[in-house]
Amino acid sequence: FYLGNFFERGQADLEPFFDFHPWLYMLLIPAVSMRLWSEEQRSGTIELLLTLPISTTSAVIGKFLAAWAFCTIALMGTIPIWFSVNYLGEPDNTVIAAGYIGSLLMAGGFLSVGACISAMTNNQVVAFTISFVVCFAFNLSGFPVVLDLFSSWTPQAVLEVISSFSFLSHFESIKKGVID
């Protein structure tokens, strides 16, 4: 509550809470996803997994959904904060629910990046490091400073594509209650 100036703002909402999610997920989600496939390759159990009577698509979707369920359970552990805000004031609960939905979607996006990178390496530390760098790049791609670096030599259409990769720009509208 103190880190996001929750009490000083004088508003009953969770916007400061959701402001930290992209940066927190940039570290936590690669840690969750680093073992999804790299450990299977390192230990040699990938052959066993691929010879089971399930399709590769089912295995990929199953691992992704299991990791996403873990992130969902971890995020649901923050529901008491929502109850605290409702006790202290009268927030717009639909905006808070939209923030939670956006947070889950962002976790899914980061998980898909991490799972893809984990499948490309058999070392967990390498998978974590590359996933962190890619997620960091996706977070920064919508910042005006980054876009200004590209604006002098790239067309506007390319800048819009670069900006569309940003998790932050999409999450900004969702955490304010706008789902588009």
Predicted regions and their residues:
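Helix-loop interface residues and adjacent transmembrane-helix termini in multi-pass membrane transporters
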Residues: 53, 120-121, 178
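Helix-loop-helix units of permease transmembrane domains in multi-pass membrane transporters
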Residues: 36-66
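Transmembrane alpha-helix boundary/anchor motif
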Residues: 28, 32, 76-80, 112, ...
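Alpha-helical transmembrane segments and their helix-entry boundary regions
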Residues: 59, 127-128
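Secretory targeting signals
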Residues: 1-3, 11, 24, 65-125
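Membrane-interfacial segments
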Residues: 7-8, 41, 45, 85-93, ...
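Terminal transmembrane helical anchor/hairpin motif
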Residues: 6-7, 11, 130-179
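Hydrophobic alpha-helical transmembrane segments
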Residues: 1-39, 64
